[in-house]
A protein has these predicted regions:
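Short hydrophobic targeting helices and cationic amphipathic motifs
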Residues: 3-5
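Non-heme Fe(II)/2-oxoglutarate
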Residues: 12-99
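Generic cytosolic/nucleocytoplasmic N-terminal low-complexity/intrinsically disordered segments
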Residues: 9, 57-58, 104, 158
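Catalytic core of non-heme Fe(II) oxygenases with the double-stranded beta-helix
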Residues: 74-188
């Protein structure tokens, strides 16, 4: 188990309604462990017909892969990699000053042949803070819709983005990179 890690991230941007970006959120050694795990050939990915939402519009680019770390219906844990991820989730929980991890999963979207914006969605209707930690070098942006204005967040390796989870948001499939990998989590 990895213990005793500290947050090294620096607050880069603060937008309205709690949209925040932290560059180099994790220390290099811990981030590299997580990156090697989820980008490696042995990590267990599970196929989703629509990575953003349960209902599918049958668009060929909606699909993706995920791996649950904390499932909302199984809060005691759902992965054999719990020891790798729990320190990270606890650090984010402290960063956003919340008491509970509602859910967390690793997500991967694949390269698209043309620009593809996934479905806008809210992870939960209840009050929560959403967090995204970017794992790999990629070009698939995150778009957060605030007051009908799109805030475009460019992915950077080891950058954490936190925001009000009641805001509609989405991601874009990469065009220049084979895949976009991130850890998405929510806290109340």
């Amino acid at each position: 188990m990895i213990l005793g890690l500290s947050i090294h991230g620096m607050l880069l941007h603060y937008y309205g309604r709690m949209i925040r970006e932290y560059k180099n959120f994790l220390n290099i050694s811990y981030f590299q462990e997580i990156s090697n795990l989820v980008c490696g050939n042995e990590f267990a990915w599970f196929y989703n017909e629509n990575i953003s939402y349960k209902n599918s519009n049958n668009n060929i680019n909606e699909h993706g892969f995920s791996h649950w770390i904390v499932h909302p219906n199984r809060p005691d844990g759902t992965t054999m990699y719990q020891d790798y991820f729990m320190p990270l989730l606890l650090m984010i929980k402290d960063c956003v000053k919340r008491n509970k991890i509602i859910r967390a999963r690793v997500d991967m979207t694949m390269v698209a042949t043309e620009k593809f914006v996934h479905d806008y969605h809210k992870d939960f209707e209840q009050e929560n803070i959403a967090a995204i930690l970017y794992i790999n070098e990629t070009d698939g942006e995150t778009i957060i819709l605030e007051n009908e204005t799109e805030k475009i967040i460019k992915p950077e390796v080891n950058k954490l983005v936190t925001f009000d989870g009641n805001i509609s948001h989405t991601g874009c499939s990469p065009l220049k990179n084979k895949r976009r990998i991130l850890i998405n989590s929510n806290y109340e």
